[in-house]
Amino acid sequence: MSEQIDIGVLSESFNEFLSAEWPREKAVAYARGDATYAADLWAQVSALGWPALSVSEAMGGLGMGTQATAALHEAVGYAAAPLPLLGTMLAVALLEAAGSGAQKELLLSGLADGSTRACVSQPSDTPLNVDGQTLNGTVVDVLDAPVASMLFLRAERAGKAVWLAIPADAQGVSTERALLADTTRSIGSVALNNVSVDSVHILVPADPVALDNELLRLAAIALAADALGGGNAVLVATIEYLKIREQFGRVIGSFQALKHRVADHKAALEAARGLVEFAAGMESDSPQALLAALTAKQHVTRIAAEVARDCIQLHGGVGFTSEYVPHIYLKRAKLNEALFGTRSVLLDRIADMLEAA
């Protein structure tokens, strides 16, 4: 079976499972609460091996690669499922690239089976400073930090860039959840007060810049795929609503002006899919891999937010009420836009890359 067919089968299985286990009714009910993640759903997807998707086969994972993880994130975005998958995926990539044999042996199995939930600070964050064997400082806006059991944080030690793998329950570590409009995910700040650090906690990358770029590439593709899934989901929900909502004695979906708006959104999302698939299909060592990922992220997240925003309008007055799903997807789309570089930041980075080429 070809890789393309394998990815299609995987994507179908992801969507079938989430449509059964996380239907819209659950998404709406969850959005009204204050949970940090769906623990029962996480246990289910962990049993199915989803966190192990990008873990190498040599370390007990599935080794499926970026196309498979993009398909997974698209399905998660479609369902607006509150799962801390991105932090786990980035932690796997970080360990595979910079971890010692002992560190991989210690940490990858927990990431693969879902018993360890990870968060990874953004590559652009100011690094912490390791002073001897002690760590002090604060890292803000870390995705999945409130639910993580293992924290992966950028740092410097003796002037060299390193990453730290710190247990969330280590003495001196505290995490504070930040308020978010998007209730399907969590972000928090991590405070470290005289935290003891030894060699088992320190990951030393051979090429820190290349590693930062690879983490950014993977995050950009995942967020673009998530946005693509969310954009399609909110459009499908809106089309269903247009077919049943009546005004002036007719279903509003029969109005040509609304048909044109839906068609425009569908066309925009299909074009966005091409960007995601192109970026996910590139080899990580390709000179254009990061450029393709950043291009996809800045464009697709914007398109998804625009689609979700207009779908609220197409729903009319109920569009932003808690009983309907459009607001969930708009909030998720706006967070996707902001994570790992806003559109303006990424456009500046893209311009610099093109100028240097």
Regions found by a protein language model. Give the residues of each.
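N-terminal glycine-rich flavin-associated loop
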Residues: 82-101
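Cytochrome P450 C-terminal beta-domain/meander region
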Residues: 125-136
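A short, Trp-centered hydrophobic/proline-enriched beta-strand micro-motif
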Residues: 113-123
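A generic structural signal for well-ordered coil/turn residues at beta-strand boundaries
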Residues: 91, 114-116, 147-149, 160, ...
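Alpha-helical interface subdomain recognition
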Residues: 1-79, 114, 134, 214-357
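A short core secondary-structure module
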Residues: 121, 138-174
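A generic local secondary-structure boundary/capping motif
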Residues: 95, 107-109, 127, 139-143, ...
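Flexible, small-/acidic-enriched active-site or ligand-binding loops
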Residues: 141-144, 167-204
